[in-house]
Amino acid sequence: MILELAILDVRPGETVVFERAFAEAKLLISAMPGFEHLELRRCLENSDRYVLLVTWQRLEDHTEGFRGSAEYERWRELLHRFYDPFPTVEHYASPVAELGRPG
C-alpha cells in the first residue's frame, strides 16, 4: 500500500465552496483502479488548510492511472482553482512503525 499525502491551502473565504466541489471530486477518485481509501481533514490551527490522505494499492495507480485519466481532468477542473499555493504531493511506503490502542 502507498499513502499519498498533500497539504491543501485553500484561498481564504472559499472553504465552503471547496468542500462542496470536493464532495463531487471524491467520487471520481474513488472509482479509479487501485484506489483504497481517502480522508480529507481540515486543520484546527488554520481553517483554510486541509490534509488529503489517499491510500493506493501501487504508486502507479496514482501517478499513471489516475493522473493520466479523464477523471483526473475533471478533478483538476473542480479543485485546482482553490489552491494557493499549489500543493506538493508526496507518496509514502508502508509504515516503519505503527501503534494503536486495542479495540
Regions found by a protein language model. Give the residues of each.
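Glycine-rich beta-strand-turn "strand-cap" elements at beta-sheet edges
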Residues: I2, E39-N46, R76-G103
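An amphipathic, aromatic/His-enriched active-site/gating alpha helix that lines ligand/cofactor pockets
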Residues: L27-E36, T55-E90
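Residue-level signal for secondary-structure boundary sites
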Residues: V16, E60-H62, A97-L99
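Short, surface-exposed ligand-recognition loops at beta-strand->loop->(often short) alpha-helix junctions
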Residues: D9-R20
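Conserved GNAT-fold acetyl-CoA-binding loop/helix
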Residues: E19, A23, S69-A70
